[in-house]
Amino acid sequence: MNISFEKIAEAHRIPIIDIFNYYIENSFAAYPDKTFGYEFFDKITDNTKGYPAYAIKSDEKIIGFCYLSAYNPLPSFKKTAQITYFIAHDFIGKGIGTLALKRLEDDARNVGVDIILAHISSLNSESIKFHLKNGFRECGRFENIITKLNRSFDIIWLQKNI
């Protein structure tokens, strides 16, 4: 398996939204309760201006995406970014998330970011374990603030200083 990272571009619109919509429909990893149309890709590209954002490819097939975005748009927060990544469900557990995290950490340093935040559903135990294993620590928890599929759950905030 040959993994590569390609800057997010228009050609990635459909596979990226399809991957995200899979998680909307089948998990608590993505918070919306209804899938998005392909125009949602424009929101991703708007939110990632000035930050690294990639389609993840395996042998020319898009198998995920990852990006950093502003935690807060105020200039006083410029050293803090929020991380997002979704890997196609049939590629989970193959080290791709680790590659994506390392790539984004390296790029974060290059754009002056030294704190990365992740917010994760309390029902997504695999993601929580992944982040803790990779140097994140829990820094906050909002209890029962979201309801999806008739289940209320917490949002856990994790932080990594790089």
Language model features with spans:
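Glycine-rich acetyl-CoA-binding "A-motif" of GNAT/NAT acetyltransferases
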Residues: 61-64, 126, 152
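Conserved GNAT-fold acetyl-CoA-binding loop/helix
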Residues: 17-44
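Conserved catalytic-core motifs of GNAT/GCN5-like acyltransferases
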Residues: 117-120, 137-154
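Conserved beta-strand-loop-alpha-helix junction that forms the acyl-donor binding cleft
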Residues: 118-128
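Conserved acetyl-CoA-binding loop-helix of GNAT-fold acetyltransferases
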Residues: 93-108, 129-133
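A short beta-loop-alpha structural element at the N-terminal edge
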Residues: 2-16
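Conserved GNAT acetyl-CoA-binding A-motif
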Residues: 108-120
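Acetyl-CoA-dependent GNAT
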Residues: 35-90, 101, 161
